[in-house]
Amino acid sequence: MDSIPQFLIAAPTSGSGKTTVSRGLMALFVKKGLKVQPFKCGPDYIDTKYHEAVCGRPSINLDTFMASPEHVRSLYARYSADADVAVVEGMMGMYDGYDRDRGSSAEVARLLGIPVVLVVDAKSAAYSMAPLLSGFINFRPDIRIAGVIFNRVGSPHHYRMLQEVCEDLNVTCLGYLPKQKELEQESRHLGLDFSRSKETEGLDMLAGLLEEHVDWELLLSTIGLPLP
């Protein structure tokens, strides 16, 4: 079976930047000529509209509360079959489900056997990220954290301090998004306007920032897996 890069984007909490990073990476991959198959954990119908506008393909909900594990795996394999890369956007905090972690993003990653890229809001923190990340890396050994992308980083020096966190924990630091007023405004308005212009607004800027500050080639090179 052919292997393709595939991963789930999760975060410690809601509001960390999952949707911003998901849309930006999808836009960047499309810009590079890749066929991107988007997915969304849970029943959310708003983020899927934004995914489809970016990728030109339907974004598929993966909901382990409403559907059986077999059905979720089947959906994932079917829609990813002709893609160059599969990107799953998580929901809420990584382990937040309806009963402990049941129905959570972590459950979807475990079910599909795909690695996680953790998006962490680093505003107003530096080495205090170490115990937080250590918990997510070690809490479930059957879920692999493929790398970390820091959001709302204040300066290159701030980012260097965050890189030291990843070095000490032996986890890949994939890069960061700098703190930008435009990105925070975009996040606040997502879901309030369903016009086509809003669905794609700011994507070029976002993709450009990720291309500049995230090692997307390293990411794609380390997460090639056969489809489940």
Question: What is each residue range found by the language model?
Answer:
Residues 127-228:
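Internal gly/pro-rich beta-alpha loop/helix module
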Residues 116-119, 174-176:
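Short hydrophobic alpha-helical runs that function as membrane-insertion/retention elements
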